[in-house]
């Protein structure tokens, strides 16, 4: 036994590794598990494909195709973004809008956002977490998000604002 060596448990190692995965997926468009493994290795975290696959599953990560229909990127539903109303939520929302917004339309007090199939719930969650003062709430289907504007804003004005956040 070596004295002075720090003792790590599988639990802390897994938690630390998963926290780093969340950080990477929140800031970088990762298109494959091998790309993610390389980014982790760059941070000194060596991981097998089986472990990485298990981590992604435990984190609830999914691979979503972007608005351009190109290669999908991994996203984590609750990716450690700031809690509602805390600065930084709109930066994450802007990134997601740029990746997922296909089109925006409006009716009355609703902005109607189109996404690639399977991405609407994820985008709606990001809008909710951004805690925009002019948004009452969201409803998501498979590829459509209804965003309700807070009066006196109209759906058309809200759609324009959300499109402008799309960097």
Curated annotation (Swiss-Prot):
GO terms for biological process: L-arginine biosynthetic process; protein complex oligomerization; regulation of arginine biosynthetic process. It is found in: Cytoplasm. Keywords: Amino-acid biosynthesis, Arginine biosynthesis, Cytoplasm, DNA-binding, Repressor, Transcription, Transcription regulation. Signal peptide: none annotated. The keyword Transcription applies. Its main location: cytoplasm. HAMAP family: Arg_repressor. Regulates arginine biosynthesis genes. This is Arginine repressor. It comes from Mycobacterium leprae (strain TN).
